[in-house]
């Protein structure tokens, strides 16, 4: 899929409170235990510059188009400085969020936003898409209860159930659109370890 690289690019996607960061970490630790060259990173962020952009993106109220370009600028830095070099060295790269999150969080706020985001991404890095994406499928009602039970620390956490549903159904739509790349892991009633075992079966 990606002619820029020799390694493998794995992403985790979904809304807030679904456990994707936990699953990213668990997969990273598993691959390390197998002596597999692997790095773990995240978006928005992953580099010094991109992490600074993240602070603005998750805490400030931006205009929709400004928010999109902030996310894309951070991604370009992240890809150029971290993801692509690691892939070219033959590493597996695990990324907590990537392009599909930009589609659902920023693209939905704009007219024809889904296509706009993917087209922008292709313009930035035409060959770089994940080899496999795990959509951690947790029902919005369950997800928002989880978020409400923890210290909410960004503008996306504190939005209401309608926002959670919108994001959830966007990821569902993407998983239907790209079934070969996006693997849906139904996780509402599973423990983190059970979810991890399902993920390992797709590797």
Swiss-Prot record:
Phosphorylation of dTMP to form dTDP in both de novo and salvage pathways of dTTP synthesis. It catalyses: dTMP + ATP = dTDP + ADP. Its EC number is 2.7.4.9. Signal peptide: none annotated. ATP binds at residues 14-21. Pfam families: Thymidylate_kin (PF02223). Belongs to the thymidylate kinase family. It comes from Rickettsia rickettsii (strain Sheila Smith). GO terms for biological process: dTDP biosynthetic process; dTTP biosynthetic process; dUDP biosynthetic process. CDD domains: TMPK. GO terms for cellular component: cytosol. GO terms for molecular function: ATP binding; dTMP kinase activity. This is Thymidylate kinase. The keyword Protease does not apply. Keywords: ATP-binding, Kinase, Nucleotide biosynthesis, Nucleotide-binding, Transferase. InterPro entries: P-loop_NTPase, Thymidylate_kin-like_dom, Thymidylate_kin_CS, Thymidylate_kinase.
């Amino acid at each position: 899929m990606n002619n820029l690289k020799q390694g493998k690019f794995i992403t985790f996607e979904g809304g807030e409170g679904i456990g994707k960061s936990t699953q990213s970490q668990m997969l990273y630790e598993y691959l390390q235990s197998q002596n597999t060259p692997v790095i773990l990173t995240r978006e928005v962020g992953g580099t010094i510059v991109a992490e600074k952009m993240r602070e603005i993106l998750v805490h400030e109220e931006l205009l929709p188009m400004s928010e999109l370009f902030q996310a894309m600028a951070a991604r370009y830095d992240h890809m150029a400085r971290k993801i692509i070099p690691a892939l070219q060295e033959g590493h597996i790269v695990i990324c907590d969020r990537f392009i599909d999150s930009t589609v659902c969080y920023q693209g939905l706020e704009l007219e024809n936003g889904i296509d706009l985001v993917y087209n922008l991404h292709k313009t930035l890095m035409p060959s770089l898409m994940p080899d496999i994406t795990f959509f951690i499928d947790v029902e919005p009602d369950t997800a928002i209860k989880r978020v409400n039970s923890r210290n909410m620390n960004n503008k996306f956490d504190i939005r209401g159930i309608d926002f959670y549903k919108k994001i959830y159904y966007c990821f569902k739509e993407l998983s239907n659109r790209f079934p070969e790349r996006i693997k849906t892991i139904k996780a509402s009633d599973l423990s983190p370890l059970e979810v991890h075992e399902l993920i390992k079966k797709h590797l």
